[in-house]
Amino acid sequence: MKQSRTKRVLAIGELKFATNTLKRLSEKYHFEFIVPDPHDRSKTIEKIHEAASKSTFDACFWLFRNAAISPFTEEMLGPLLPTCKLFVTGAAGYNNVDVDWATRNGVYVANTPNGPTEGTANMNLMLFMCTLRGAREAEQSLRLGKWRQNLSLTDDPYGKRVGIIGMGAIGKSFAQKILPLGCEIVYHNRNRLEAEEEKRLGASFVSFDELLSSSDVISINCPLTPATHDLISTKEFEKMKDGVYIINTARGAIINEDAFIKAIKSGKVARAGLDVFLNEPTPNKFWLECDKVTIQPHCGVYTNFTVAKTEECVLASIETFLDTGIPTNPVNGPFGMNGC
């Protein structure tokens, strides 16, 4: 009987925590790792092409800290076809992956929506509190030697109506964290949650317009898709309360940047907390200089727990696909075992 070929996986990046799982899977599959160049996308492309020229691969995955080498397109991944039938991204968002190209070629794209949940939701909570309490302004005042000079009274979360746009895993986790703080939680989502889950989260479903017009705090927790690009722009800001607070840990392009900056300058938005920006890793200087905005360098997932869980999710998706032909959490397909 002819012995079957050992299935091969190309890994872009290095695993830090899931070493035991990798050791177990390495008994069934062959893993080849390449280290991406964090400063030069073209060099990473060269490494992938070189690996593809020497061997065939059945699946490919990449991990965190990939902003410098994205997007993941035909230019980068094309040589892995036609044998490679799965790309797994170690993130919940997949807007930097050319899913349409992959779909045309019968290649699954899978994300890891549960891996980043806690880290991102905790970042959301941190920015929520910092924004309400004006932490950036207070810290800057102290660092300049101006002890409490010109500081205004800030807000507590109790009694605030918090509107969550996007009630997926991250939105739900954030809702659970703020419910004990005495917040009134409303949400808008593509699909309404079941009544029991709404009760568990203490969240009420409202229309998009009602969320905009009635919320004291608006939290962006939806994925970036063609439908959510510039979801919040001039007319949406006009519907909001004066002095609203904005939190965004999803993607920068969900909020139109020009309209956002105008809303902050005018006072329509009192303060904001941002972990994501339109242009990464070089955001608009306004965000770096404005005392009314608490900022982070898209690092919500940069915790030991989150990275470890995401690595396990990536490997679980790889194993499921190589064993069954269908990955965990595909965002396209379905395809047959051999693609289209």
UniProtKB/Swiss-Prot annotation:
GO terms assigned for molecular function: glyoxylate reductase (NADPH) activity; hydroxypyruvate reductase [NAD(P)H] activity; NAD binding
GO biological process, alphabetically ordered: generation of precursor metabolites and energy; glyoxylate catabolic process
Keywords assigned: NAD, Oxidoreductase
Enzyme class: oxidoreductase
Record InterPro entries: D-isomer_2-hydroxyacid_DH, D-isomer_2_OHA_DH_cat_dom, D-isomer_DH_CS, D-isomer_DH_CS1, D-isomer_DH_NAD-bd, NAD(P)-bd_dom_sf
Keyword Ribonucleoprotein tagged: no
GO CC annotation, single: mitochondrion
Official protein name in the record: Putative 2-hydroxyacid dehydrogenase C1773.17c
Organism in which the protein naturally occurs: Schizosaccharomyces pombe (strain 972 / ATCC 24843) (Fission yeast)
